[in-house]
UniProtKB/Swiss-Prot annotation:
Gene source species: Finegoldia magna (strain ATCC 29328 / DSM 20472 / WAL 2508) (Peptostreptococcus magnus)
Role summary: Catalyzes the attachment of threonine to tRNA(Thr) in a two-step reaction: L-threonine is first activated by ATP to form Thr-AMP and then transferred to the acceptor end of tRNA(Thr). Also edits incorrectly charged L-seryl-tRNA(Thr).
Region annotation (Catalytic) ranges: 242-532
Chain sites annotated for binding Zn(2+): 333, 384, 509
Limits of the TGS domain: 1-61
Record note on cofactor: Binds 1 zinc ion per subunit.
Name of the protein: Threonine--tRNA ligase
Cofactor: Zn(2+)
E.C. number: 6.1.1.3
Annotated GO CC locations: cytoplasm
Major localization listed first in the record, in broad terms: cytoplasm
Encoding gene per record: thrS
Keyword line: Aminoacyl-tRNA synthetase, ATP-binding, Cytoplasm, Ligase, Metal-binding, Nucleotide-binding, Protein biosynthesis, RNA-binding, tRNA-binding, Zinc
GO MF, any single term: ATP binding
Length: 634
């Protein structure tokens, strides 16, 4: 007899081994129809799997994140089965679920083109009608190697060879398709009612550019067609908002062949970045941070001491100076630590808060680069708080408030995630337990709901991550608050305690925007290029109705520039209707039409972006309104 505790606090007892499906049915047949999997003691499992001892079980539906993982993982196998039928001899690499759907990496002589995706979808529909059951099979490593060698599945063999000799290997069968897979999966495919194969890309085996380039097919699936239609509508809207397209149209930035992954910011783009930094610097000053600047290149021994050499070397760039090895910094924290250590500190000074808008470089594979979202160099809005252990919770709470203030200025809602200890970590169990409980306490005292993301913390400590929701419902991980007891130990950081002894400070790493470049890309898509006045590269465009009013238009421009506004004049000999339309296409916040009537009455005829004609206004009063809107970041 064993006990199963359920999410609602109730419990059920069972005599012997039982499938999760049968546990679900014992609660409700309706629940069993809707469920796609279960979380058992924190681990996602398929309904076909069994339990035989005391545990906590939460059944999940497609709407749950864990449910989507199961649904999309099975959809990946469904696609692979269709490909096996259509293109015999295909070698299958890996096919996981991802944040938005699934993919499978494939090795085949057939070069996939977009037209093939429709053919594969049609075959997937046939398989769904056949509704083959998924069967979970456990075999020995030796049997698995023999099976996949005989089938010529070299990539599966490569994966299996990395398992221990005595490992039990899990396979999943779907009709004639058999895959090496830990699961979990759906019971069958009948509920995969709507799907779309989205794109074809290239991917190196194991992400190593020295290995063979494979073909990757991405897809998405849902239990209802309505959900697929809504998703495709959002995708279409996302295409219109693509920051690479808008960035080019608005003259914000470019990526040149001479520097893949290294963005070039144009004058309009620098306006946006400068306004972002100005906003941040004002808030840093108000909240008691000092600003620092540390070198881009630092001696290799620093990165050994910090642990980055052991945990991050593959993402770093290196150089030699005077015969010694140096690294281009991938993170700002070691520099901040050296600044702290340059002076002796008393407990009375703590907390000490230092911020750096520091440029970092991180190696990314060329195939992973994507506009401003994935680059090789970026400015990180880092700050480090050195404090007493008893100050941790208060300082984390203040940092949460700081993040909330910044995000609300852009209209972002957000969700919070607490990431715990990864396998590749530094430090004792006691340090990690204290760090995690400190972050939990801060979140709970703020009343913020949060999810636990097991094993996704930094190698030196747990972290709180902020996931922002943009205007079309996509989420972006931006801000992070990380607690670190390891760096103070490694760098022998101290302060003088009240009793005169030397003690270790706690260290909080935090970033709010994260990468400035990535955050700018998010803002471009969030606003679809229609920035609020304070961020707009061109806030006002003056449109004289004929050439004879150009001189007055330039006088007005100078008057507005003197008040700090960004203003352009369209002095072309074109019809005013054309000028208005083109001004709207340029996403200018305000277009001012100037003619004799406006000059005689000291007025401007105002058109506001997305609203249109808002009538005539007194010129001086309108300028005052704009200055107020700009300075107060409305």
């Amino acid at each position: 007899m064993f006990e199963v505790k359920l999410k609602d606090g109730s419990a059920k007892e069972f005599d012997g081994e039982i499938s999760l499906l049968d546990v679900c049915k014992s609660i409700s047949e309706g629940l069993a129809r809707d469920c796609v999997g279960a979380v058992v003691d924190g681990k996602i499992m398929g309904l076909m799997e069994t339990i035989d001892s005391d545990c906590e079980v939460q059944f999940v539906k497609f709407d749950d994140d864990e449910g989507k993982q199961v649904f999309w993982h099975t959809s990946s196998h469904l696609m692979a089965y269709a490909i096996q039928r259509l293109y015999p001899g295909t070698k299958f690499a890996i096919g996981p679920s991802i944040d938005s759907g699934f993919y499978y990496d494939l090795d085949t002589d057939h070069k996939f083109v977009p037209e093939d995706l429709e053919k594969i979808e049609a075959e997937m529909k046939k398989i769904v009608k056949e509704n083959p059951k998924l069967v979970r099979v456990e075999i020995s490593r030796k049997e698995a190697l023999e099976r996949f060698k005989n089938e010529g599945q070299d990539y599966k063999v490569d994966l299996i060879e990395n398992f221990d000799e005595d490992a039990t290997i899990t396979l999943y069968e779907m009709g004639d398709f058999v895959d090496l897979c830990r699961g979990p999966h759906l019971l069958d495919v009948k509920n995969i009612k709507a799907f779309k194969l989205l794109s074809i890309a290239g991917a190196y085996w194991r992400g190593d550019e020295n290995n063979k380039m494979l073909q990757r097919i991405y897809g998405i699936s849902f239990p209802k067609k309505k959900l697929l239609d809504e998703y495709l509508d959002r995708m279409e809207e996302a295409k219109k908002r693509d920051h690479r397209k808008i960035g080019k149209e608005m003259g914000l930035f470019s990526i040149q062949e001479e520097g893949p992954g290294f963005p070039f910011f144009h004058p309009n783009g620098m306006v946006v970045l400068n306004e972002l930094e100005k906003f941040l610097k004002e808030q840093l000053l108000e909240r008691g941070y000092g600003q620092i600047k540390t070198p881009l290149i630092l001696n290799e021994h620093l990165w050994h001491q910090s642990g980055h050499w052991d945990h991050y070397k593959e993402n770093m760039y290196f150089t030699k100076i005077d015969g010694e090895d140096y690294a281009i910094k991938p993170m700002n924290c070691p520099g901040s630590i050296l600044v702290y250590k340059d002076e002796l500190h008393s407990y009375r000074e703590l907390p000490i808060k230092v911020a750096e808008l520091g440029q970092v470089h991180r190696h990314e594979l060329s195939g992973a680069l994507h506009g401003l979202f994935r680059v090789r160099t970026f400015v990180q809005d880092d700050a480090h708080v050195f404090c007493l252990p008893e100050q941790i919770e208060e300082e984390v709470s203040k940092t949460i408030d700081f993040c909330d203030y910044i995000y609300s200025k852009f209209g972002f809602k957000y969700e919070v995630e607490l990431s715990t200890r990864p396998e590749d970590s530094m430090g004792s169990d006691e340090d990690w337990d204290l760090a995690i409980s400190s972050l939990k306490n801060a979140l709970e005292h703020k009343g913020l709901p949060y999810k636990i993301n097991e094993g996704d913390g930094a190698f030196y400590g747990p972290k709180i991550d902020f996931h922002l929701e943009d205007a079309i419902g996509r989420t972006w991980q931006c801000g992070t608050i990380q607690l670190d007891f390891q760096m103070p130990e490694r760098f022998d950081m101290t302060y003088i305690a009240s009793d005169g002894s030397k003690k270790r400070p706690a260290m909080i790493h935090r970033a709010i925007l994260g990468s400035e470049e990535r955050f700018m890309g998010i803002l471009i898509e969030h606003y679809a290029g229609k920035f609020p006045l304070w961020l707009s590269p061109v806030q006002v465009e003056i449109l004289p109705i004929s050439d004879k009013f150009n001189d007055y238009a330039y006088e007005l421009q100078q008057k507005m520039k003197a008040r700090g506004l960004r203003v352009k004049v369209d002095d072309r000999s074109e019809k005013i209707g054309l000028k208005i339309r083109e001004s709207q296409l340029k996403k200018v916040n305000y277009s001012l039409i100037i003619g004799q009537n406006e000059i005689d009455n000291n007025e401007v005829s105002v058109r506001k972006r997305d609203i249109g004609d808002v009538g005539s206004k007194n010129t001086d009063e309108f300028i005052n309104e704009l200055v107020d809107e700009y300075q107060n970041r409305k």
